[in-house]
Amino acid sequence: MPNPDTATMTPREIVQELDRHIVGQHDAKRAVAIALRNRWRRMQLPEELRNEVMPKNILMIGPTGVGKTEIARRLATLANAPFVKVEATRFTEVGYVGKDVEQIIRDLADTSVKLYREQAKVRVRNQAEERAEDRILDALLPRRAAGIGFDPEAARNEPSSQDNETRIKFRRMLRNGELDEREIELDVAVNASMDIMTPPGMEEMGQQLRQMFSNLGSGKSQKRKLTIKAARPLLIEEEAGKLVNEDDVRTAAIEACEQHGIVFIDEIDKVAKRGEAGSSGGDVSREGVQRDLLPLVEGSNVSTKYGTVKTDHILFIASGAFHLAKPSDLIPELQGRFPIRVELTALTKADFVRILTEPKAALIKQYEALLQTEGVALTFAPDAVDRLAEIAAQVNERQENIGARRLHTVLERLLDVLSYEAPDRDGQSVTVDAAYVDAQLGELVQDPDLSRYIL
């Protein structure tokens, strides 16, 4: 179910939340924030009008590495909604070799069921923990049989006072971790999953075969000798699975998939027809993919193993760099289904400085935390941040512009020696300044051939 704390967030609040993770691109954030708020608005309408209001799908246009995918992913996380990301190039027209576009909705349904199953397990976790404790205590303290007609369930409900006192004592020790290293023998459910390789375009058949073999092996268990520390999470997971009503999970998940699902289609420009003259034979398949996508975006029924999913109210966000093609190269019917168009700007040096320092999980904070696990106190001076941003911008300008992803490459190269030597430098403090950056990267930046292959 959508997070009640975020379901009523205003567009301004949604943008502010996205700002904590993504730098710049205000227009794109506004567009997705309005789209998310419109879902809440639609749910407040009378049912007959609610079904007539269709989502306004979004087309994001911008170079790689500027935040298109991250905006969509953060939006789905914020809304606690089923989300799936696909590349348009992985799909081909029905009849060609490749994946069927309806697999997108099947993947979304899988994601939704998994999300709702995990949420259901969280709700019953306390009860599952108690049941797991009882099973561990039963293994530690076998109940005494009482001859013919002995009922173990009745014995569990009405234990003797001596048994009760012992179990209370052992339960306390169990919760305090005093019994973690003790070994016990348990009947643990067997996971009957089987990995089946299928040729392109037959993924649905592979899923059905996996499900069939899983059902054949369900209910089986095997005796295993484990430490209590290792057995406890297995038992909690098993007991939580027993407490969850799978039918309720599937019903709620399919409804969430239909009403709140978000599909992000990347590289949509790669299936656009590029120009009139000199077009390749691949254009036939490209247009076929667009025509196959059209029913999903317009609204259709897709059969999944959980039931039929209606795509009428699923939000589709498509993105592409559109270097060689233009949005107008998409077939007119598909263009009309993406009424909101947002252009994301290329990142500048100033943007890189902000990306390195401002987000909640900024890159510099990540590297500082990683090396702190080795006892190395790493800090970045402001002039180092400025120099790193300048180098990333220069390399992007000279080579292929890969946006913020260039920062990962530059930082990995910068900290290569330190990451290797970190275990031997426990307790040391290291400050990275502009001089250190130039010492590590200066030669690479100045030599265009080296920077092409290393940065």
UniProtKB/Swiss-Prot annotation:
Known function: ATPase subunit of a proteasome-like degradation complex; this subunit has chaperone activity. The binding of ATP and its subsequent hydrolysis by HslU are essential for unfolding of protein substrates subsequently hydrolyzed by HslV. HslU recognizes the N-terminal part of its protein substrates and unfolds these before they are guided to HslV for hydrolysis.
Self-association and partners: A double ring-shaped homohexamer of HslV is capped on each side by a ring-shaped HslU homohexamer. The assembly of the HslU/HslV complex is dependent on binding of ATP.
The encoding gene: hslU
PANTHER family referenced in this protein's UniProt entry, alphabetically: ATP-DEPENDENT CLP PROTEASE ATP-BINDING SUBUNIT CLPX-LIKE, MITOCHONDRIAL-RELATED, ATP-DEPENDENT PROTEASE ATPASE SUBUNIT HSLU
SUPFAM superfamilies documented for this protein: P-loop containing nucleoside triphosphate hydrolases
Family: Belongs to the ClpX chaperone family. HslU subfamily.
GO molecular function, one term: peptidase activity
Protein name, per record: ATP-dependent protease ATPase subunit HslU
Protein's GO biological process: protein unfolding; proteolysis involved in protein catabolic process
InterPro entries recorded: AAA+_ATPase, ATP-dep_Clp_protease_ClpX, ATPase_AAA_core, Clp_ATPase_C, HslU, P-loop_NTPase
